Amino acid sequence: MPHPSSRQAHLVLADGTVLTGDAFGHRGSVVGEVVFNTGMTGYQEVLTDPSYAGQLVTFTYPELGNTGVNGDDQEADHPHARGVIARQLAPCASNWRCSESLDNWMERHGLVGICGVDTRALVRRLRDGGAINGVISSDGRSPADLLAEVRHAPSMEGLNLASQVSTTEPYEWSSPCRVGFDQRLKQHPDLPYRVVAIDFGIKRAILDRLVAHGCAVTVLPSDADLDTVMSHQPEGVFLSNGPGDPAAVDSGIDLARSLLERANLPLFGICLGHQILGLALGGKTFKLGYGHRGLNHPCGTSGQVEITSQNHGFAISADSLPEPMVEVTHLNLNDRTVAAFQHRHQPVFGIQYHPEASPGPHDADHHFGRFVALMADRRDVGG
């Protein structure tokens, strides 16, 4: 549905493709990598997830904004996606928690959107040709001018975006900011486990799940070094999700390598953190054609499958991980890429998907308990 005060907008891809629709949200122009998310719900969590920094997100579900936005479902204080591409904008929002329409929220936060375009055709283009840079614009410029702009935009490969979304100051996170799903947890320890989380673009839901599993979390900037981490006397270190190319996050790789070599602490990485752990162990990463962004990706090896929430454009090359030191424990069953690994001799593991969901299924929440169990074992032996 067109915006009530509709203005024409263009989406121009770097290959010359032009789609014309209606502007919504903030009026203006923005360049980013065009990707797609196949989830039917959770657009507020997606748009505020720092892992989407630098991207124009196409939603495959045909209508957006049905439930508006609320104060609980944000993964950060503000949106991190650069733009929104939708087939249709809902004419009204209806939900008991709704505090604002998606359109107004996007306008307030300066988030540019385009609707009324053939998202099915666009997703087929991205699926067949891969993610590509594009520009959304409602500022009146011609498609030819926009094409010239987007062709000068940098590729996602080689970009360290984690440094742009990370906190600049340490902070503590010890109580959940919202009520979550049925946690099904055992009694918390009398003394919470001290966890240092390295913020490459961390989601609030991850912090909430760590707390729900009995952790007191100190969040440090993405450029924290080993001395800074160890000064907090952690019982475990968590490497967070985040945007961009993992191979460009030199400080994170150096820290993970130092932790592996000198700290002998439980290490747990999710998404970008998983990739950084893999790189620190000697592995290599590569860019996926169009990435994994959705809520129903099956992952496993044999005997048990987890339906998972995913959001990443890079993956670890299975052949690059050092054997037998590192074991691949889960594969994405859609394309057989590495979904999780563990170290055979150290309390270290990484998973490519999102056990905290938000949005998505909770099949993989037990990985937080797995991390806590490693810290409990270390505490029991006086580590």
Swiss-Prot record:
Name the SMART domains on file.
CPSase_sm_chain
- List ligand-binding residues for L-glutamine: 51, 242, 244, 272, 275, 311, 313-314
Q: What class of enzyme is it?
A: ligase
Q: Which GO terms describe its biological process?
A: 'de novo' pyrimidine nucleobase biosynthetic process; 'de novo' UMP biosynthetic process; glutamine metabolic process; L-arginine biosynthetic process
Alphabetized Pfam families for the sequence: CPSase_sm_chain, GATase
Q: Where is this region: CPSase?
A: 1-190
Where do the Glutamine amidotransferase type-1 domain residues begin and end?
194-381
The disulfide bridges present are none
Extract the CDD domains matched here: GATase1_CPSase
Q: So what EC number does this one have? A: 6.3.5.5
GO molecular function terms attached to this record: ATP binding; carbamoyl-phosphate synthase (glutamine-hydrolyzing) activity; glutaminase activity
What pathway, per the record? Amino-acid biosynthesis; L-arginine biosynthesis; carbamoyl phosphate from bicarbonate: step 1/1; Pyrimidine metabolism; UMP biosynthesis via de novo pathway; (S)-dihydroorotate from bicarbonate: step 1/3
InterPro entries membership? Anth_synth/Amidotransfase, CarbamoylP_synth_ssu, CarbamoylP_synth_ssu_N, CarbP_synth_ssu_N_sf, Class_I_gatase-like, CPSase_GATase1, GATASE
Task: Kindly identify the residues recorded as the active site.
Answer: 271, 354, 356
- UniProt keyword list: Amino-acid biosynthesis, Arginine biosynthesis, ATP-binding, Glutamine amidotransferase, Ligase, Nucleotide-binding, Pyrimidine biosynthesis
Family stated for the protein in its record: Belongs to the CarA family.
Q: How does it assemble?
A: Composed of two chains; the small (or glutamine) chain promotes the hydrolysis of glutamine to ammonia, which is used by the large (or ammonia) chain to synthesize carbamoyl phosphate. Tetramer of heterodimers (alpha,beta)4.
Q: What does this protein do?
A: Small subunit of the glutamine-dependent carbamoyl phosphate synthetase (CPSase). CPSase catalyzes the formation of carbamoyl phosphate from the ammonia moiety of glutamine, carbonate, and phosphate donated by ATP, constituting the first step of 2 biosynthetic pathways, one leading to arginine and/or urea and the other to pyrimidine nucleotides. The small subunit (glutamine amidotransferase) binds and cleaves glutamine to supply the large subunit with the substrate ammonia.
PANTHER family per UniProt: CARBAMOYL-PHOSPHATE SYNTHASE SMALL CHAIN, MULTIFUNCTIONAL TRYPTOPHAN BIOSYNTHESIS PROTEIN-RELATED
Tell me the protein's name.
Answer: Carbamoyl phosphate synthase small chain
Q: What is the lineage of its organism?
A: Bacteria, Bacillati, Cyanobacteriota, Cyanophyceae, Synechococcales
Gene name per UniProt: carA
